[in-house]
A protein has these predicted regions:
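Long, non-catalytic architectural segments outside compact domain cores
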Residues: 1-72
Length: 72
């Protein structure tokens, strides 16, 4: 998958870490974070490699967690 911008996994993981919602955050905020986590895992999986299947599973789990939070 060609991307117009260079993907730097370390920068993306660091940003995700620092934007993680704290205790008491609204469900919508936490769900949005899980969606961002899912997108990151999808991008990692798109680069292929031996962990691609596991990364896709993590993306799916993140999206499902977000869906449940939005539904509550």
């Amino acid at each position: 998958m060609a991307e117009s911008k260079t993907f730097n996994a370390i920068i993306e993981l660091t940003a995700l870490f620092y934007h993680r919602p704290g205790a008491g955050a609204a469900d919508e905020e936490v769900a949005a974070w899980y969606q961002a986590k899912g997108r990151l895992y999808e991008r990692l999986a798109d680069h292929g490699g031996p962990e691609a299947a596991q990364e896709r599973a993590c993306a799916a789990a993140s999206y499902e967690h977000a869906r449940r939070l939005f539904a509550s």
